[in-house]
């Protein structure tokens, strides 16, 4: 399956760079700073080794030995058995299911959008959880008080993601 997600355009800011680094570590197996530097360069982000080292420290990235023996960078609570590059769907579903199971009241697709209804006051939290996961075809979210709009790259992606969100929310 080909990923039709348009490339994100990032401003040349420290915050955007940190976000790009974190996203790279969450979605790929990165074994060295030079590899990470190249990934960032491919996104138009030039960074020195010293800056990259400080950035990795700031986002609390650590080197972790994967199940196959490879040593790679990990962010947050990733562990050896849950590296997203080896099993992205299971990890993503598990994390999202914990939140969505009690907070999603309905889901509907409309063109390239998915509309998610929540109890009053929960939409911002649900949107944040969705935004933090590397979900193929999802560009981002917008949240109000009780409604989240998930912006997808294409209409058919929105239909699949709506069903997926409904399935994940129903797992409790």
UniProtKB/Swiss-Prot annotation:
Organism: Bifidobacterium adolescentis (strain ATCC 15703 / DSM 20083 / NCTC 11814 / E194a)
One Gene Ontology cellular component annotation held by this UniProt entry: cytoplasm
Family matches, as SUPFAM superfamilies: C-terminal domain of arginine repressor, Winged helix' DNA-binding domain
The protein's annotated pathway: Amino-acid biosynthesis; L-arginine biosynthesis [regulation]
PANTHER family for this protein: ARGININE REPRESSOR
Protein name from the UniProt record: Arginine repressor
Taxonomic lineage from the root: Bacteria, Bacillati, Actinomycetota, Actinomycetes, Bifidobacteriales
GO molecular function: arginine binding; DNA binding; DNA-binding transcription factor activity
GO BP annotations, alphabetical order: L-arginine biosynthetic process; protein complex oligomerization; regulation of arginine biosynthetic process
InterPro entries, per database record: Arg_repress (IPR001669), Arg_repress_C (IPR020899), Arg_repress_C_sf (IPR036251), Arg_repress_DNA-bd (IPR020900), WH-like_DNA-bd_sf (IPR036388), WH_DNA-bd_sf (IPR036390)
Domain of life: Bacteria
Record bears the keyword Plastid: no
Major location (coarse): cytoplasm
């Amino acid at each position: 399956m080909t990923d039709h997600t348009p490339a994100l355009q990032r401003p040349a800011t420290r915050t955007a760079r940190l976000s790009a680094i974190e996203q790279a570590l969450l979605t790929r197996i990165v074994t060295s700073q030079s590899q990470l530097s190249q990934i960032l360069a491919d996104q138009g982000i030039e960074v020195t080794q010293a800056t990259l080292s400080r950035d990795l420290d700031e986002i609390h990235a650590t080197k972790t030995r994967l199940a196959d023996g490879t040593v790679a960078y990990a962010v947050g609570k990733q562990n050896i058995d849950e590296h997203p590059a080896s099993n992205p769907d299971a990890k993503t579903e598990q994390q999202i299911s914990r939140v969505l199971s009690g907070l999603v009241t309905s889901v509907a697709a409309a063109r390239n959008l998915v509309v998610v209804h929540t109890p009053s006051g929960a939409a911002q939290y649900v949107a944040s959880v969705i935004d933090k996961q590397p979900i193929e075809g999802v560009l981002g979210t917008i949240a109000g008080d009780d409604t989240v709009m998930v912006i997808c790259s294409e209409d058919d992606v929105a239909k699949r993601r709506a069903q997926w969100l409904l399935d994940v929310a129903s797992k409790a």
